[in-house]
């Protein structure tokens, strides 16, 4: 089982430690559904790729991401490469295990790419990674941070593993441990209920839930790979982006 959560954590830590506090990454602290990051129902979101990515990859990403549109009153439009006006701007020139996205309308407040997809077309996890990152682009947060998830994280084991992986790259042990502690707090532990609107029940089958290894938790707690949109994922989209005449549940 590929540990996507750990790979992304290592990537963020390297970005922070190498860039320094002034430029320590573009992702903001997020909630499962932060109202200020939602798009408008019925809006057309333009998708542009940076650089000169493979045409087959672009089509596959667009086709897979469009599965969300079956449950959300939104449209996607694939526009020319390197279009800075696009709401979703994707770079693919990253390491294969690097995949991330800004949350919803946060993409409007940064320059350059708002999403990175290092996954290759041949990767068996291609669909689930694309769906997961586009879930973020539509305003969804990681399900493992749901206020009611109650995941028994073994934070000591996680911290030790991350420190060992980065020990040769960071000369200041205390700075490294502080960065790891901050990352575990903001990216692993549950969010406050007040930060989550709308709050639906915790869903271990959500495409937004990373697989979790038993080695990173106490007891026998683990989660396998989720490969498709769950019923809650679909309902969440209908609440955020209701079609005309349908009832939604979102802050404005």
Please give the residue ranges for each predicted region.
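Zinc-dependent metalloendopeptidases
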Residues: 1-252
């Amino acid at each position: 089982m590929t540990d996507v959560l750990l790979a992304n954590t290592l990537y963020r830590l390297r970005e922070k430690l190498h860039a320094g506090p002034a430029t320590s990454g573009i992702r903001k602290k997020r909630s499962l559904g932060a109202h200020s990051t939602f798009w408008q129902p019925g809006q057309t979101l333009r998708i542009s790729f940076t650089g000169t990515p493979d045409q087959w990859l672009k089509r596959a990403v667009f086709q897979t991401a469009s599965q969300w549109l079956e449950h959300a009153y939104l449209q996607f439009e694939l526009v020319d490469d390197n279009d800075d006006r696009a709401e979703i701007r994707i770079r693919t020139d990253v390491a294969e295990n690097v995949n991330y996205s800004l949350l919803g309308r946060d993409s409007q407040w940064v320059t350059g790419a708002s999403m990175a997809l290092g996954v290759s077309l041949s990767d068996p996890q291609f669909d689930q990674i694309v769906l997961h990152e586009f879930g973020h682009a539509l305003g969804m947060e990681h399900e493992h941070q749901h206020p009611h998830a109650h995941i028994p994280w073994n934070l000591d084991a996680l911290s030790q593993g991350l420190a060992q992986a980065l020990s040769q790259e960071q000369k200041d042990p205390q700075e490294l441990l502080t960065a790891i502690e901050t990352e575990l707090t903001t990216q692993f532990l549950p969010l406050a209920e007040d930060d989550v609107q709308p709050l639906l029940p915790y869903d271990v089958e959500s495409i937004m839930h990373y697989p979790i290894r038993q080695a990173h938790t106490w007891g026998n707690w683990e989660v396998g790979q989720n490969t498709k949109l769950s019923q809650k994922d679909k309902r969440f989209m209908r609440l955020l982006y209701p079609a005309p005449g349908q009832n939604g549940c979102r802050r404005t």
